[in-house]
Amino acid sequence: MSTRDTKGYLHGFGEAEEARLRRQARIVEHRIHGTLPFRRCRRLLEVGSGVGAQTEILLRTFPDLHVTSVEAAEGNLAAARRHLGAQPWLNGRFDATHGDGNALEFPADTFDGAFLCWILEHVGDPARVLSEVRRTLRPGSPVVVNEVQNATFFLSPYSPCTLRYWGAFNDHQFALGGDPFVGAKLGNLLQRVGFADIETEVRPVLLDNRHPGERAEFLRFWTDLLLSGCEELIGAGKVDTETVEGMQGELRDVATDPDAVFFYAFVQARARTA
């Protein structure tokens, strides 16, 4: 499977999905980008860059950085070029390229850093993608990989339709050749392909009455994420409309419950080339 192609990506494509991805990047920015080790990097590789939402944050955070992004979906690539190209302060600081993470078209020792975010969950052979990334990096270059661990999702009040939908969501991603639990495997994957100084950190999102504003924002984002796969799941026969309607009702109830709790955790892995 190529990197983030139309077969392995169940959220759909188009303007609504582009807007959702940009909103998602803004909401989780402080949980991902706060301490990235790219201060000394000048040529960064980003694999599976989608609509360029993470690319924009990287370029804003590191003003001396040039990012070469690789994306397999032509629609996403066009959206990234359009959005980033419309911002004069980014002129000359990025190259948005069409390519396959399984076979990167760059010579060895091209880049001095790499960033991957929410991409390995969508590919059939994440070790191969990471091996290709390592090949293109100079010795001592940092790599950061952010990935999902979908088994961690918890919602209170208890929401059986939502959990049933979530199970079908993950099962279908497996059927498409992806892995919704790849975050827990990043240490093994990075070690297998020869990276050194590997560190993994579980980054939890626990939102309750102490953070009502952020909880409300995250629940809106999470509802959009779930519904982005609705058409694909119904079409594949993985869920029925009754389950979807039940989930929507539960999510509305959770959003107005004064004691609602949302929990999810992803994994950020860091390593270096030897």
Predicted regions and their residues:
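C-terminal helical/coil "lid" or tail adjacent to the Rossmann-like core of SAM-dependent
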Residues: 10, 16, 199-260
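Class I SAM-dependent methyltransferase SAM/SAH-binding core
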Residues: 43-45, 51-103, 128
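Class I SAM-dependent methyltransferase Rossmann-like catalytic core
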Residues: 4-26
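A short acidic, Gly/Pro-enriched loop at the edge of an enzyme's catalytic core
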Residues: 102-113
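A short glycine-rich, Lys/Arg-flanked "PGG" loop and its adjoining helix->strand segment in the class I
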Residues: 127-142
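Conserved catalytic/acceptor-binding region of the Class I
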Residues: 144-212
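Conserved alpha-helix/loop element of class I SAM-dependent methyltransferases that forms part
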Residues: 23-42, 57
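A short SAM/SAH-binding and catalytic strip from SAM-dependent methyltransferases
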Residues: 112-125
